[in-house]
A protein has these predicted regions:
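Reductase modules of NAD(P)H-dependent flavoproteins
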Residues: 2-3, 141, 148-216
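Generic structural signal for buried aliphatic residues
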Residues: 38, 89-92
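Short helix-loop-beta connector
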Residues: 104-109, 212-213
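Ser/Thr-glycine-rich phosphate-binding loops at phosphate-binding pockets of nucleotides
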Residues: 115-120
Length: 216
C-alpha cells in the first residue's frame, strides 16, 4: 500500500437511497488539479479494494470529498455505503485525469455536461477561480431520473450565489441547468435530446454550440 494514504472519514451524507457523499481528512502532501480523480477504497482481507473516484472538493480545501452511487452488489460500493465517521478510507497519493482546465483551448463558454454521479469533477471545477477568469459563461447541465437525485442542488441554487468569494462571479457567469427524465420538473428530458432539439440553448439564452466559442 505504498502508493496509498489512509484518510479518516469526517462526514457522510446520504442524499437518498441511491446516492451519498463522503468527506475525509486530507494529507498535507496531496496535490491535485480540479477535475482529477483518485483511487479510493477500503482494506478487505488485508488487501486494498479500490475504484476511481473524481475528487468533488476543490484543491484549496483542507478536506477531500467524494460522490458515489450505492450499488448493492458492487465489490466496493456495497461496503462503502456503510462507512461511518471515524472510519478509514484509502486514497491514492497521485490523483490524475484529463478533465482539467489545462486540457481546454481558450473559449467563451464552458459546458460541463453530466448525468448522475458524473457531476463529481464539476463540483470542484465550479469552485475554481481560474474557471471564472477564463470563461464568460460556465454552464453546468446535470441530468438525473428523479428530482431527489439532484445532489448538491442547494449548493448551486443558494450557497454559491451568496458565497463571499464566489458569489459575484457565480451570479454573473454560472448557469445551473438541472433536468429530470422520470417525473415532472421545470426542465425535463435527457441531456442529449435537449441539446439536439435546441431547447437547452433556448432555455439558457445562448446560441447553439460552435467550435469557436464553446468548450465541453
Amino acid at each position: 500500500m505504498s502508493k496509498l494514504r489512509t484518510e479518516t472519514v469526517t462526514e457522510v451524507h446520504h442524499w437518498n437511497d441511491a446516492l451519498f457523499s463522503i468527506k475525509t481528512t486530507r494529507d498535507d502532501g496531496l496535490r491535485f488539479r480540479n477535475g482529477e480523480f483518485a483511487m479510493i477504497g477500503l482494506a478487505v482481507d488485508g488487501r486494498p479494494l479500490l475504484r476511481a473516484y473524481s475528487i468533488a472538493s476543490p484543491n484549496y480545501e483542507d478536506h477531500l470529498e467524494f460522490f458515489s452511487i450505492k450499488v448493492q452488489d458492487g465489490p466496493l460500493t456495497s461496503r462503502l455505503q456503510h462507512i461511518k465517521v471515524g472510519d478509514e478510507l484509502l486514497v491514492s497519493k497521485k490523483p490524475t485525469g484529463t478533465l482539467v482546465l489545462d486540457d481546454l483551448l481558450p473559449g467563451k463558454h464552458l459546458y460541463m455536461l453530466s448525468t448522475g454521479t458524473g457531476l463529481a469533477p464539476f463540483l470542484a471545477l465550479a469552485r475554481d477561480p481560474e474557471v471564472y477568469e477564463r470563461f464568460d459563461k460556465i454552464i453546468l447541465v446535470h441530468g438525473v431520473r428523479y428530482a431527489d437525485d439532484l445532489a448538491y442542488r442547494d449548493m448551486f441554487e443558494n450557497e454559491l450565489p451568496n458565497d463571499e468569494i464566489f458569489g459575484e462571479w457565480f451570479r454573473e457567469k454560472f448557469i445551473y441547468y438541472p433536468t429530470v427524465t422520470r417525473e415532472e420538473f421545470r426542465n425535463q428530458g435527457r441531456v442529449t435530446d435537449l441539446m439536439k432539439s435546441g431547447k437547452l440553448f433556448e432555455d439558457i439564452g445562448l446560441p447553439p454550440m460552435n467550435k469557436d466559442d464553446d468548450r465541453v
